[in-house]
Design a protein with these regions (language model features):
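Conserved beta/loop motifs at nucleotide-recognition and modification sites
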Residues: 1-233
Length: 233
């Protein structure tokens, strides 16, 4: 089956991470110094007719090679019609998505890199199953904080992001940070930036975290429990 190396999909309900991963790839593979090297097709459909037009624009973009040759990137950005909603279930939408999937299965031009990003995807649909066989698919879902052990997963994410921006945590400050902020990656990134500016190069300790980080509802519960444990109430 042709074209598997130039089809990339980023799915999941963690919108910030989905968008960032797709953006990073587009910046990596898009031709440099070529304003026509990246074509973005907005995937936000208002209704089924709009979804059909979006798919048509995507197909046209894939099939239209650069006038002067070379490579191009087509990014179907933030598609909202792969989900189990009214627009996604419409017959016209399903036919359009089927035509797009058929095109991908037939193989897209090797000069084209296709990126698809979507936060809501019905994993029961044929599209999802077939795109997983066709291309490189990454999924970014929000961590379920109702399940035991969620803190470890979020701590791994924070540790990786902190390293990227040069932020270090001292002792149990990382754990406190996660327990106070929660699992929303957008909020985590924002709070890490604030904390990094505050500590200005030194390792962040628990007091820094408590002083600077905004407390989420989840964090408020933790703070109350922590205060009770320390008999501070």
């Amino acid at each position: 089956m042709a074209g598997t190396e130039n089809i990339h999909a980023f799915f999941g309900n963690d919108e910030a991470r989905v968008k960032e991963a797709a953006l990073r790839l587009s910046q990596k593979v898009a031709p440099k110094d070529d304003e026509f090297g990246l074509e973005i097709v907005s995937g936000a459909a208002d209704n089924a007719d709009h979804a059909v037009r979006i798919v048509g624009s995507t197909v046209e973009a894939i099939q239209t090679l650069p006038f002067f040759g070379g490579e191009k990137v087509v990014w179907l950005q933030g598609a909202n019609f792969f989900s189990d909603n009214q627009t996604g279930k419409a017959e016209s939408t399903l036919r359009a998505v089927e035509s797009l999937t058929g095109l991908l299965e037939a193989g897209i031009p090797p000069e084209v890199q296709l990126i698809i990003s979507a936060t809501e995807v019905d994993k029961r649909r044929a599209f999802y199953k077939r795109i997983n066989k066709l291309g490189n698919v990454e999924t970014f879902d929000r961590v379920d904080t109702s399940k035991p052990g969620w803190e470890g997963e979020v701590m791994s994410y924070v540790a990786g992001r902190a390293e990227e921006i040069g932020l270090n945590f001292e002792g149990s400050a990382l754990e406190r940070f996660v327990l106070m902020v929660g699992a929303d990656s957008r909020v985590l990134d924002s709070e890490m930036e604030k904390l990094s500016l505050y500590v200005n190069g030194r390792a962040a300790n628990e007091e820094d975290v408590s002083q600077i980080v905004a407390t989420s509802h989840l964090g408020a519960v933790f703070e109350i429990g922590d205060a009770i444990a320390k008999k501070n109430l």
